[in-house]
């Protein structure tokens, strides 16, 4: 990850995944700075792979507008991993790339749960709000997005009101 010139965090292994390593080798994105400040007690700085001890559950990269053009290159370079785009929960604007072991995403998690519960995907409705919900929504028989989801996702799914305007309530009334 060092070769992309993007700072990142490495979440430690469960149950200690609230602890993380982080880099500050490149100009720091304001959202990244806020994340580090918010969770400072749990973070340890590193400046090379040698600083990493133990296993990891997730990498998080926060991209600025220029770095966003690297998204497909990173996905291609890390083809054996799940590289999931999401919007920052901190500023609701910054683009995060979350990198997990291959096959780890909301869609597979949902399928695993449905299988254990003996429920067919054709019986499932889902509501999402961001890019990290795509894998989950794509397995649902009825897939909805809240109206304040990213515009370029909205043409792919049915829409309900925004999460600020009782979109969840509208979703429930449509699927029940």
Positions of PLM-derived features:
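Conserved acidic, metal-coordinating active-site core of Asp-based
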Residues: 4-7, 11-125, 134
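Mg2+-dependent phosphoryl-transfer enzymes with acidic/Ser/Thr/Gly-rich catalytic loops
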Residues: 97-176
């Amino acid at each position: 990850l060092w070769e992309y010139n993007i700072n990142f965090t490495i979440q430690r292994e469960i149950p200690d995944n609230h602890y993380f390593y982080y880099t500050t080798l490149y100009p720091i994105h304001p959202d990244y700075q806020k994340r580090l400040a918010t969770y400072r007690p749990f973070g340890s700085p590193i400046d090379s792979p040698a600083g990493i001890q133990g296993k990891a559950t997730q990498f998080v990269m926060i991209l600025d507008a220029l770095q966003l053009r690297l998204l497909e290159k990173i996905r291609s370079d890390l083809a054996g991993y799940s590289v999931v785009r999401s919007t920052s929960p901190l500023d609701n604007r910054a683009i995060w790339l979350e990198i997990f072991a291959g096959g780890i995403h909301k869609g597979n998690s949902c399928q695993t749960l449905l299988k254990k519960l003996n429920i067919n995907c054709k019986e499932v409705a889902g509501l999402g709000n961001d890019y990290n919900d795509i894998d989950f929504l794509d397995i649902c028989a009825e897939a909805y997005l809240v109206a304040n989801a990213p515009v370029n996702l909205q043409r792919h799914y049915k829409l309900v009101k925004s999460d600020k305007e009782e979109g969840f309530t509208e979703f429930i009334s449509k699927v029940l």
